Amino acid sequence: MAKRGVSRREFIKATGAGALATGLGANIIVPGRAHAAKKTLKILQWVHFVPAYDEWFNKKYIKEWGEKNDTEVTVDNIGIAGLSARAAGEISAQKGHDLFLYNWPPPTVEEQTVDMKDVVQECERKFGKPIDLAIKSTYNPKTKKYFAFSPSFTPDPVNYRQDLFGQVGMPKGPASWDDVRQGGAKIKKQFGNPVGIGLAQEIDTAMAMRTIMYAHGSHEQDPDGNLTLDSKQTLEAIKFVKALFEETMTPEVFTWDASSNNRAMIAGKISVALNAISITRTAEKQDPEISKKIQLTKALKGPVRAIGLEHVMDCYVIWKFAENIEGAKKFLIDYVSNFRTAFLAGEFYDFPCYQKTVPDLAKLIANDPKAHPPDKYKVLEDVLNWATNVGYPGYSNAAIDEIYNTWVLNVMFAKAASGAASPEEALSEAEAACKRIFGKWKDKGLV
């Protein structure tokens, strides 16, 4: 996606503003002349990458829930690139939606959100403990607060062209990052299809670069939230990405947005992409022939481990200034209770953070009549063994969030890959930026 014109941090400077005064006149009810106003619940979330999900959620689910709970529920959908600015605007005005969905952990807005501890506890009572990925993405161990609630996440498998990799001796696709480098170079040379991993200021690049870092044993922080970016392992990851770009890719990746790899893969232009199953689902509908050629594999092995990130972490927040806090909490608990329906409506895009809500998940993804072949999505059955959170091996804290949303690591890798800076220079610049960011949030007491 394009670089945001105004960062979340810049907007948050305005959060000291008090709640807007509300006139009383509209709330006066004359006995015998009017009924109590119907409750309302206002939700904002992204335009889902699987349109069938929005069709179900917007036109069916919220209406049914509203009728059962005597509440008028409305939902506003905006593109993922606009979420941060919209959230910052609501915080600045101290007015907006009751439920706001981020597609990544949002710890920088913790001071503006309601603690979700009771929602987590109720869902845990009903469905057992949430997955560790959900806790690491929504809980602050420093303040002991759940600043958000995550009902689901999206796996981030490797999408690859099976026909092309088969012709360079890898019929089951790449199993390691070195396979991508070697196989990708051969494919580009023989067939002209480059590797399609972004090096731009957008979310897919942010996830892919961290995946490569973590596989190399490099991390932004340690388990206790101490900065650890400046390491031999990070330098090796940067050098690897530089070589990967030079040997397998094309300069267009420097200007990609979050959907560029989707479009390029479906158009038959690239050999590999790291993305959710939105690529394969779209291909099934738009081009069944290319769909048969695109297959999935698990997280790739690096020098240290095989690991991948979540592609989307669904994190709902309830603002402290929300008008229907209790209704918003009940909506989330009920949504988790109905998550199997959501899982099916989203065509397996969103996986449950409470695993008992979809007890037959493995069976469902192992035999999908829409897929080519029907067991294409079976590869995701053990996703929790290789998927992790932004900020691994620590929590997704406020410093990690700011580093993520200001594209510090994206820029680090892009500068080195393009030759704008040496790997050492790019790392030094990123380390300096991260030190400032960690220092700021430690001073605020949130890290």
Language model features with spans:
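Extracytoplasmic "Venus flytrap"/periplasmic binding protein-like
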Residues: K39, K63-I131, D163-A175, A264, ...
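Hinge/lid segment of periplasmic solute-binding proteins
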Residues: Y102-P157, T211, K293-L300, K376-V383
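Glycine-centered hinge/linker elements that transmit conformational signals in sensory
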Residues: G183-K186, D224-F254, A299
